[in-house]
């Protein structure tokens, strides 16, 4: 059993949400009718379902954890969910929008994840990312509540981002028009796949 599967085996069903309404609003702010949407790290599939309900023509959810995919298929049987390791099951430039919510902090190989996200996005397509922010207010809060619990080596979070480091990461992987804002304890980022043909506004 992989580390990711072990995390999901111990997770409550359904998984409790973190800033779910803010994250859903961020996604729906950008979904356009008729577009193809990839939910990268889909978990139980609720954001994929929200994109479909908002009018996306085709939605695919993928996750590395078999248990997550099982739950997503059970909760949303009319949508497509697949388990993946590294390469995404999609052609180059086949999606208009890639949604990656609360995933980057759990991934050791961010290079493969972001390279694949860029590969499957069409030129000018949009990547949306949410991740916990670790600017000064959060660090102070963690200090008060206990660093050890948050940075437990057996815990799920492997990486920690500030707005600056997240922006730099996306730039390094060929994204442009990058916007990062903090909302509550989370960072919300949007970025376009670099190229000549921009996504319609």
Please provide the spans of the model-predicted regions.
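Conserved N-terminal segment of class I S-adenosyl-L-methionine
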Residues: 1-91, 97, 114, 129, ...
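Short conserved AdoMet
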Residues: 32, 108, 122
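Short N-terminal helix/helix-N-cap motif within the alpha/beta-hydrolase-1
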Residues: 67, 108-112, 139
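Acidic/polar helix N-cap motif
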Residues: 91-92, 109
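A short beta-strand submotif of the Rossmann-like class I SAM-dependent methyltransferase core
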Residues: 100-103
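Residue-level signal for the nucleotide or nucleotide-sugar donor/cofactor binding architecture
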Residues: 105-108, 161
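A short glycine-rich, Lys/Arg-flanked "PGG" loop and its adjoining helix->strand segment in the class I
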Residues: 111-123
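Conserved class I S-adenosyl-L-methionine
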Residues: 128-150
């Amino acid at each position: 059993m992989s580390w990711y599967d072990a995390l999901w085996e111990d997770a409550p069903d359904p998984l409790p949400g973190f800033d779910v309404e803010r994250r859903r609003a961020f996604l729906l702010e950008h979904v356009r009718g008729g577009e193809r949407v990839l939910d990268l790290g889909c978990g139980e599939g609720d954001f994929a379902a929200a994109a479909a309900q908002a009018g996306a023509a085709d939605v695919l959810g993928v996750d590395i954890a078999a248990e997550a995919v099982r739950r997503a298929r059970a909760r949303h049987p009319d949508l497509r969910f697949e388990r993946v390791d590294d390469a995404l099951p999609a052609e180059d430039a086949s999606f208009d929008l890639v949604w990656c919510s609360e995933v980057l902090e759990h991934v050791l190989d961010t290079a493969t994840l972001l390279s694949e996200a860029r590969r499957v996005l069409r030129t000018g397509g949009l990547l949306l990312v949410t991740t916990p922010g670790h600017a000064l207010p959060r660090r102070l809060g963690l200090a008060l509540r206990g660093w050890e619990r948050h940075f437990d080596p057996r815990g799920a979070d492997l990486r920690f981002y500030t707005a600056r480091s997240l922006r730099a990461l996306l730039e390094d992987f060929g994204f442009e028009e990058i916007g990062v804002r903090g909302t509550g304890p989370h960072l919300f980022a949007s970025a376009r796949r670099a190229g000549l043909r921009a996504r319609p506004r």
